[in-house]
From Swiss-Prot:
Keyword Glycoprotein: no
InterPro entries: NH3/CH4_mOase_suA_sf (IPR037001), NH3_CH4_mOase_A (IPR003393)
Subcellular location: Membrane
Upper lineage: Bacteria, Pseudomonadati, Pseudomonadota, Gammaproteobacteria, Methylococcales
Membrane topology listed for this record: Multi-pass membrane protein
Membrane spanning residue stretches: 23-43, 59-79, 86-106, 111-131, 145-165, 215-235
Species whose genome carries this gene: Methylococcus capsulatus (strain ATCC 33009 / NCIMB 11132 / Bath)
Gene for this chain: pmoA1
Protein name: Particulate methane monooxygenase beta subunit
Assembly, per entry: M.capsulatus has two forms of methane monooxygenase, a soluble (sMMO) and a membrane-bound (particulate) type (pMMO). The particulate type is a nonamer composed of three alpha:beta:gamma heterotrimeric protomers assembled into a cylindrical structure; the beta and gamma subunits comprise the bulk of the membrane-spanning regions and the soluble regions are derived primarily from alpha subunits which form two antiparallel beta-barrel-like structures each.
Keyword annotations: Membrane, Monooxygenase, Oxidoreductase, Transmembrane, Transmembrane helix
EC class (word): oxidoreductase
GO function term, MF aspect, one: monooxygenase activity
């Protein structure tokens, strides 16, 4: 076969080759997004989501939704702009959870023997469903940024409460009152640097009363609106068509 001849012999074979290339491209793009989103998550909210004794009512509730609304906004905008697919945020979050569970099982448990109920990742699926549903029903990025991103921030703590509630039960341990998550932190020693020597319910944000989770959630929701609005432009930028002019 010469260089000028086609590598396929029929239209059906050409279609099959095209579909194979599409699946290979989707496979590569999916894991590139999973890897980059996972690295972004680990470098930003990292420790607050690594350990059960860091999943508190103040910083974990505030930081995690703000820094993780980025990739869902961009991917959702791209898929909606190009293909009118309303599940970009959900697919993005499911990919992140896949990468996190692989990391927690093989690295945290397989190499360092931290138990899974000490290093489990947070659930972001409820917020992603809200983002996709609002965009699908409204078709407006502005409305999705205001309502959807606010729902993303507000639903984060209630969506994870069934998972972390058993670890926040107060117990007496050696004459001290602490949570089960704090006991896990004492028994599974990590690094000795000062930022790891903390207790989950010793925060200082007590101006608004006893429970600070609603304050943290509303602040996180407000910031998520701004971050979503900025990052959705990245997805729209990637969805633009560009042509090279012939000379």
């Amino acid at each position: 076969m010469s260089a000028a001849q086609s590598a396929v012999r029929s239209h059906a074979e050409a279609v099959q080759v095209s579909r194979t290339i599409d699946w290979m491209a989707l496979f590569v793009v999916f894991f590139v997004i999973v890897g980059s989103y996972h690295i972004h998550a680990m470098l930003t909210m990292g420790d607050w989501d690594f350990w059960s004794d860091w999943k508190d009512r103040r910083l974990w509730v505030t930081v995690t939704p703000i820094v993780l609304v980025t990739f869902p906004a961009a991917v959702q905008s791209y898929l909606w702009e190009r293909y009118r697919l309303p599940w970009g945020a959900t697919v993005c979050v499911l990919g992140l959870l896949l990468g996190e569970w692989i990391n927690r099982y093989f690295n945290f448990w397989g190499w360092t023997y931290f138990p899974i109920n000490f290093v489990f990742p947070a659930s972001l699926v409820p917020g992603a469903i809200i983002l996709d549903t609002v965009l699908m029903l409204s078709g407006s990025y502005l409305f999705t940024a205001i309502v959807g991103a606010m729902g993303w921030g507000l639903i984060f703590y209630p969506g994870n409460w069934p998972i972390i509630a058993p670890l926040h039960v107060p117990v007496e341990y050696n004459g001290m009152l602490m949570s089960i998550a704090d006991i896990q932190g004492y028994n599974y020693v990590r690094t000795g640097t000062p930022e790891y020597i903390r207790m989950v319910e010793k925060g200082t944000l007590r101006t608004f009363g006893k429970d600070v989770a609603p304050v943290s959630a509303f602040f996180s929701a407000f910031m998520s609106i701004l971050i979503y609005f900025m990052w959705h432009f990245i997805g729209r930028w990637f969805s633009n068509e560009r042509f090279l002019q012939s000379t």
